Amino acid sequence: MGQFTVVSLGLLAMFLSLSGAKGDNCPASWISRNGVCNKLFPDRKTWLEAEMYCRALKPGCHLASLHRDSDSTVLAWYISDHFKGAGHVWIGLRDTNRKRTWKWSDRTSTNYFSWNQGEPNNVQDDENCVHLWAPSGYLKWNDEPCASLHPFICQYKL
């Protein structure tokens, strides 16, 4: 009887600890990284159309924000492995005030940048949105006119 009680209490404790834990489960077509879910959408949209599409998917969903090299690497592998020839891919960074002050659409901090060499260059004073640059293997960023059409990555926190 004593062993049964110990096992039962152990299972109860495990159940209670797991029931309060946040799972790291993204829907089947999304990838998980560092507590967020990401998905690439191959439809070509403007930056604003892409951001609005992400927001309509789920509360708290936005174009992807990247905050460290490991975030960039995981998404680069994902895009390269599953979407060959996708072209450049929108992320959630843009210069809303046209003053070279870059902000994420999810309002998280902008303490990490992975610009391609010579970027951001704001060609013709019209490059205020950011995409993952395909020739860099999606590891580097480029500023681009927001009206350009690209696939995009949506992201939400678990």
Curated annotation (Swiss-Prot):
Keyword Secreted among UniProt keywords: yes
Tissue expression from the record: Expressed by the venom gland.
Primary localization: secreted
A GO molecular-function annotation: carbohydrate binding
Binding site for Ca(2+): 127, 142-143
Disulfide bonds: 26-37, 54-154, 129-146
InterPro entries assigned to the protein according to its UniProt record, in alphabetical order: C-type_lectin-like, C-type_lectin-like/link_sf, C-type_lectin/snaclec_domain, C-type_lectin_CS, CTDL_fold
PROSITE patterns referenced in this protein's UniProt entry, alphabetically: C_TYPE_LECTIN_1, C_TYPE_LECTIN_2
Cellular location(s): Secreted
Task performed by this protein: Mannose-binding lectin which recognizes specific carbohydrate structures and agglutinates a variety of animal cells by binding to cell-surface glycoproteins and glycolipids. May be a calcium-dependent lectin.
The protein, known as: C-type lectin lectoxin-Enh4
